[in-house]
Amino acid sequence: MYNILQLSDIHYGADYDGKFDTADQWDAVVRSAQKTLPTGYDAIVITGDIVDDDPNVSDDVKRERYEKVFTDALDLRKNEKSPLLVTPGNHDNRAILTEVADKVLPCLQWGLKQTDGFKDVGGQCLFATVGSKTLVILDSGTVDPYKGITKLAAHVLENKWNKEDTLLFTHKPFQNSRLYHRFMKDNLLPAEVGDLIAPYTFEYFCGHFHHLATVNATTINSRLNGVDVNMHVCPGIQCQIDPYSKDCVAIPIPGYQVITFEESSNSAVYVHPVILDDYVVKDKT
C-alpha cells in the first residue's frame, strides 16, 4: 500500500487580525500526520498557498516561513528518496518559494524541460512515480482561468501518461466561466467537472477552497462519454470555510488528506480526509 500526503492552504505565519494562529495549526497538522502514519509517507504534495505574500512582511521572514514548512514536511517522508512536490497558490510569492525550494529541496526539479514537451507551456510541471502511479503537479501558469488546462499541457498529459494511473494535482481547481465558483458556494456541475478532467486523469486533486469536498462526475459531453472521474478538494490547514453560510464563515480547524493505493496498475485510489475537530485555538494571552 502506498500513502500520499496532501497538504494545502497553509498560509503559514498569517493571523488575519488575530483570527488564526496558522503556525500553531501547521504544527498540529504535522503532529497529526506523524501519528496517522508513523512510518512516513511515500510522497508529499503541497498544493499551494503556503506563505502569504504580505507586503507588510519582509522577504527574509517569508523565506524563514517557507523553509520551516519545507523542512517539517521533509521529516514526514518515508525515506530520503520519497518525493516532496510543491506548487504555488494564488497567495504565494513564486520567486521566494522557488528560491527556498531550490535551497531546501535540492532534488526538486523546477522549470520545464523541452524533452518533456513543456516548452513555452506558460507554467511549471513537476512529476514523480510512486508505485504504479504518476503524480503530476501543475502550477497556475498551466491553467487558463476560463478554459481549464492550456492546450500544450493538455497535449502532454494526454500523450505522456496513462490516465488510469495518473494522479493530477493543482492549487485551484479546473475552471471555466460556468464551472468555477468561489468557495463552491454555488452549484458545481458534476458533468462539467467530468468533461474538463477526463481527458487527462480519472483522479484529480486540488485545494484553494478550504473546504473538504469530493465531486463524483460522469462525463456527458467529452469524447470519453460515460467515464467516471473524481475531483477531491483537500481541506485547508489555515481553516475550513463553510460555503453555504451567508458570509462564507471560516472556522479555524485545520485539515489534510491521505491518498492510498495498491502497487498494481489501474488499482483503485482511496482518499482519507483528516479534520482536526478537537483542535483548540491557541490562547495568545
Label for each model-derived stretch:
Residues 59-155, 192, 200, 220-235, ...:
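Extended active-site neighborhood of metal-dependent phosphoesterases/phosphodiesterases
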Residues 248-285:
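A short C-terminal boundary segment appended to hydrolase-like catalytic domains
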Residues 2-15, 37-42, 85, 122-184:
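Metal-dependent phosphoester/phosphodiester hydrolase catalytic core
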Residues 59-66, 161-201, 209:
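Active-site-proximal segments of metal-dependent phosphoesterases and phosphodiesterases across multiple
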Residues 1-67, 161-162, 285:
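N-terminal active-site segment of His-dependent metallophosphoesterases
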Residues 6-8, 43-49, 84-90, 138-139, ...:
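Active-site neighborhood of phospho(di)ester-bond hydrolases with catalytic His/Asp-centered motifs
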Residues 16-21, 56-62, 147, 179-183, ...:
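Short, solvent-exposed loop/turn segments at secondary-structure boundaries
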Residues 14, 52-55, 93-97, 144-145, ...:
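Short catalytic/ligand-binding loop motif for oxyanion handling, primarily in non-cytosolic enzymes
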